[in-house]
């Protein structure tokens, strides 16, 4: 029986790619990629020529069974996403779950993810935190924010740049205008930036300065 490797890829700077990740991607029989065009650029940079197959949120329900069967047949497979660690707000959970259910060894390499550097750079308490990722856009969003209003741990969210100010305004309604928070964007890229302050101050900043790039919001938990 083969093995499934979950391989993180850089969220920005290609120098964040590990030697081990490169070696694994060169050795496996098949690479499952969220977007073969995006991953193709990465693989070409590191001279990785192995076969790629598309594996994303639209088709993963259909491809999981065939992938599991190939691993059962002795092939080694690597799972990558466009950036970061597969399964963290990206496709990956389904194939990992099915491999576990079928007794297939799953090995996840340590590596890049956007929320950890954003959390550390925020300056907010990080001994305990909760990762919320992307909140629902419509149904359930307000319910979830209401449930988090009493959360004591630091909270971490992903958001798109064009919805950032609206999201911060919603946070103000549920967490209070004076709640400390930070917004990190373009982690590990040329224009990386972290802005810290109260939710109101962040709204003012990003209303005046249109945000671009991938966004991580870190919000302090409620004080005792």
How would you describe each model-predicted region?
Residues 1-57:
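Glycine-rich, flexible N-terminal cofactor/catalytic loop recognition
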Residues 54-61, 134-136:
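Conserved helicase motor
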Residues 3-4, 73-78, 154:
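Loop/turn-to-beta-strand initiation segments
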Residues 94-151:
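Class I SAM-dependent methyltransferase SAM-binding "motif I" and its flanking Rossmann-like core
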């Amino acid at each position: 029986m083969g093995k499934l490797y979950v391989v993180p890829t850089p969220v920005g700077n290609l120098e964040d790619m590990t030697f081990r990740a490169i070696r694994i991607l060169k050795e496996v029989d098949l690479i499952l990629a969220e977007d073969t065009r995006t991953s193709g650029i990465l693989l070409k940079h590191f001279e990785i020529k192995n076969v790629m197959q598309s594996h994303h949120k639209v088709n993963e329900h259909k491809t999981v069974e065939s992938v599991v069967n190939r691993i059962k047949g002795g092939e080694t497979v690597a799972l990558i996403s466009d950036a970061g660690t597969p399964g963290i707000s990206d496709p990956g959970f389904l194939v990992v779950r099915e491999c576990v259910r079928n007794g297939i060894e799953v090995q996840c390499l340590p590596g890049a993810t956007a929320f950890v550097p954003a959390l550390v750079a925020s300056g907010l308490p990080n001994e305990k935190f909760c990762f919320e990722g992307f909140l629902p856009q419509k149904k359930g969003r307000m319910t979830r924010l209401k449930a988090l209003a009493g959360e004591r741990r630091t909270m971490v969210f992903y958001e798109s740049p064009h919805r950032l100010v609206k999201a911060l305004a919603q946070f103000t309604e549920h967490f209070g205008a004076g709640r400390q928070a930070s917004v990190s964007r373009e982690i590990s890229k040329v224009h990386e930036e972290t802005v810290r302050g109260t939710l109101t101050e962040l709204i003012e900043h990003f209303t005046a300065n249109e945000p671009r790039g991938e966004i991580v919001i870190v919000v302090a938990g409620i004080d005792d």
